[in-house]
Amino acid sequence: MVGKIGFVSLGCPKALVDSELILTQLSAEGYETAKDYSGADLVVVNTCGFIDSAVEESLSAIGEALAENGKVIVTGCLGARKNADGSDLILSIHPKVLAVTGPHATDEVMQAIHLHLPKPHDPFTDLVPPAGVKLTPKHYAYLKISEGCNHRCTFCIIPSLRGDLVSRPIGEVLLEAKRLFESGVKELLVVSQDTSAYGVDIQYRTGFWDGKPVKTRMFDLVNALNQIAREHQAWVRLHYVYPYPHVDDILPLMAEFSEHGYGVLPYLDIPLQHAHPDVLKRMKRPASGEKNLERILAWREACPDLVIRSTFIAGFPGETEEEFEYLLNFLEEAQIDRAGCFAYSPVEGAKANELDNPVPDAVREERRARFMAKAEDISIKRLAKKIGKRVQVLIDRVDESGGIGRTIGDAPEIDGLVRVLPPTKPSKRYRTGEIIRATVISSQGHDLIAET
């Protein structure tokens, strides 16, 4: 009898990749994935434990799985959280779960599954696609290049949950990228906790790819991904890029995108968090000494098509009105294309909880609202400049009203969309996963309307 596993995946793209690894192993061993709790022999819940709302969502999901199914294995970042007395947080709230593991723990999860639901005798490993099992649509996928983080930002507990930086071998990463492109992926989203630090933990060790030596470092990785993507007429999007000086080296590759139409996109997701030097110092941000505004302006000079996304925190402990106004001015001068903002929320175990002068809740929320109003105004004005221009659009889905997709400046789920009107020729149909060219005819908030 084939064992059926229910699966719940919560949290960030890194956690999603962990879920994909577990599901790939389950498929390789002959297990099936159940569509609902009632049809599952047991349920795996991959949790998030970064901020309080994520903890609540994860605990609620565990409780629901226990109520609906009764047999639950928990993995992910929340699995690494402990109570003040050192006891397991999850087991203290949900003592009936079968097992608890931390993040990136595929082997431990599989051992727990084997214990409570022995694997089928005939695994049919040849039925697993070379690219593995993916939770994203077939035309885009996340590529995790490293695990953990060496930074000790005061608002963050990721290092205590996921450990220090561990870079994957560059040959292994590039092989996975090639297999994903060969499986039909048209957009590869590079993720990690710090993409710019790739290889620093192993002193940029020399690896091998395509029979040639290649350094385990950011530029060499991006350069190779750029070449592979062009060969497969696909895109590569970089996330979690810290603004270190060596990031300058990849801007020429991005500037070439307009000539080829494929390769590494002129898009950088940079987790800046703030702009004022004193706030960055209290946050213990790794780039607090960098002149971020000057660097961003230089990047735009080197690559005029560059789109920058970033996230920020409003109301961090000790933040004054003057420091917040400094952040708003930075946002205006840097012309951040896509910006998100969180009102600071204390995270259990974070060093920031010990800082003086906490900002009142109402002030935090008021500053977040002011930030988002400014960010939206900048984004809308920058999008309006695209009206009348030809853009590439990756089609995410098709309906009776045409196609819905994204430009090179839009990452899935977090940025804007493009509504492409139906083709003028009745015989023409858009296809999910194809990259088309369209003319922007109007903008609506964060989104665009285009026609072919």
Curated annotation (Swiss-Prot):
Protein family according to the UniProt entry: Belongs to the methylthiotransferase family. RimO subfamily.
Database matches in Pfam families: Radical_SAM (PF04055), TRAM_2 (PF18693), UPF0004 (PF00919)
SMART domains cross-referenced by the UniProt entry: Elp3
Domain annotation TRAM: ranges: 384-452
Cofactor(s), names only, from the UniProt record: [4Fe-4S] cluster
Protein name (database record): Ribosomal protein uS12 methylthiotransferase RimO
GO cellular component: cytosol
SUPFAM superfamilies xref list: Radical SAM enzymes (SSF102114)
Taxonomy, superkingdom: Bacteria
PROSITE patterns: MTTASE_N, MTTASE_RADICAL, RADICAL_SAM, TRAM
Positions bound to [4Fe-4S] cluster 2: C149, C153, C156
Keywords: 4Fe-4S, Cytoplasm, Iron, Iron-sulfur, Metal-binding, S-adenosyl-L-methionine, Transferase
Record Gene3D superfamilies: Methylthiotransferase, N-terminal domain, Nucleic acid-binding proteins, tm_1862 like domain
BP GO terms, sorted: tRNA modification
Cofactor details (free text): Binds 2 [4Fe-4S] clusters. One cluster is coordinated with 3 cysteines and an exchangeable S-adenosyl-L-methionine.
Recorded GO MF terms: 4 iron, 4 sulfur cluster binding; aspartic acid methylthiotransferase activity; metal ion binding; protein methylthiotransferase activity
